[in-house]
UniProtKB/Swiss-Prot annotation:
Domain FAD-binding PCMH-type: 23-194
Family, per entry: Belongs to the MurB family.
Role description: Cell wall formation.
Name the UniProt record assigns to this protein: UDP-N-acetylenolpyruvoylglucosamine reductase
Keywords: Cell cycle, Cell division, Cell shape, Cell wall biogenesis/degradation, Cytoplasm, FAD, Flavoprotein, NADP, Oxidoreductase, Peptidoglycan synthesis
Enzyme nomenclature, EC number: 1.3.1.98
């Protein structure tokens, strides 16, 4: 990495523009990170000594429940390139501050498909491994090669492979033991040269059929376009209505528990997993409990997608968490299923 350089710290920094819920909270200190050297300088600056650090990219997967008494690192690292290729795949590196959707679009434009099912997911490249983002039959970990990160406590640069990242369903090492310990600076993806479409989800298949591709093998661009169309139809724009996308993970239950649920609820939406367990559609469970479109204080459940909690104007992070807890209690009482929140709550 480059040698440290000085950079401005901003006191009493407003975080409302930097979280997609639009919570009106502030940080004690903040600085914008555009280079490796600036990151090192921020970590070593005596003004931030002893302060808690929070890394923000797009702010699309965080619930801020109050002012942050520490240093916020606004990651704006840019750059994307093919670092190598072999007979089987391209290896593409992107800096952590790159917009995720724009990166996916770029890989397609460069003739390197493989990420199209993850189009239009909000946030940055650096946030993708933390959450192990996924949608419509693909998880990021399936295209992951490695990442570079800086340890907050020491400023040491490390390179981590998939094993060290311990990816799970919307989970990783960075949400568990590694939480608040690292700043991801770049991610390298492995995009296979032998491509096969993943168009099995009903919404995607229906959208492809609507544009005359129901019986044809879709191209990567066609799947990209279908995913974008479906997401825009179902999910609110966070710049218009504050939200963090899907708020709850789809719960996975044992086969016996699913059979008992299906006997009582024959219309339950489910997806059989390779290990025999069954993934349930959290949105369906929430809708069945009557929460779709409801409001609690200034927080609410979106009218078209029950998985999405929204800020209807002036809501606090505490109000959103209170709404989430009420939903979790109702789902647990009716179905005996525990819903887990996707965003990081601070």
């Amino acid at each position: 990495m480059s040698q440290p350089e000085s950079l401005p710290f901003i006191a009493d920094f407003p975080l409302k523009p930097h979280n997609t819920f639009g919570f009106d909270v502030r940080a004690r200190l903040a600085c914008r990170i555009e280079t490796d050297a600036q990151l090192l300088a921020a970590l070593r600056d005596p003004r931030a000594a002893g302060l808690r650090r929070l890394v923000l990219g797009g702010g699309s997967n965080v619930v801020l429940t109050g002012d942050f008494d520490g240093l916020v690192l606004l990651v704006a690292l840019r750059g994307r390139k093919v670092v190598r290729e072999d007979d089987e795949a391209w290896y593409v590196e992107a800096a952590a501050g790159e917009n995720w959707h724009e990166f996916v679009s770029w890989t397609l434009a460069e003739g390197m498909p493989g990420l199209e099912n993850l189009a239009l997911i909000p946030g940055t490249v650096g946030a993708a491994p933390i959450q192990n983002i996924g949608a419509y039959g693909l998880e990021m970990c399936e295209r992951f090669a490695s990442l570079r990160a800086v340890e907050l406590a020491t400023g040491k640069l490390v390179e981590l492979g998939a094993g060290a990242c311990r990816f799970g369903y919307r989970d990783s090492f960075f949400k568990q033991e590694g939480r608040e310990r690292f700043v991801i600076v770049s991610v390298t993806f492995r995009l296979p040269k032998v491509w096969a479409p993943r168009a099995g989800y009903t919404d995607i298949a229906r959208q492809l059929a609507a544009v005359g591709l129901g019986d044809a093998t879709p191209t990567p661009q066609a799947i990209f376009d279908a995913v974008v169309a479906v997401r825009r139809a179902k999910l609110p724009d966070p710049f218009v209505l504050g939200n963090a996308g899907s708020f709850f993970k789809n719960p996975v239950v044992e086969s016996a528990q699913f059979d008992a649920l299906a006997a009582k609820e024959p219309e339950i939406v489910s997806y059989r997993q390779a290990d025999g367990r069954v993934k349930l559609a959290a949105g369906w469970l929430i809708d069945r409990c009557g929460w779709k479109g409801r409001t609690l204080g200034a927080a609410g459940v979106h009218e078209r997608q029950a998985l999405v909690l929204v800020n209807r104007g002036g809501a606090s992070g505490t109000e959103v968490l209170a709404l989430a807890k009420a939903i979790q209690q109702d789902v647990a009482q009716r179905f005996g299923v525990e819903l887990e929140a996707e965003p990081v709550c601070l």
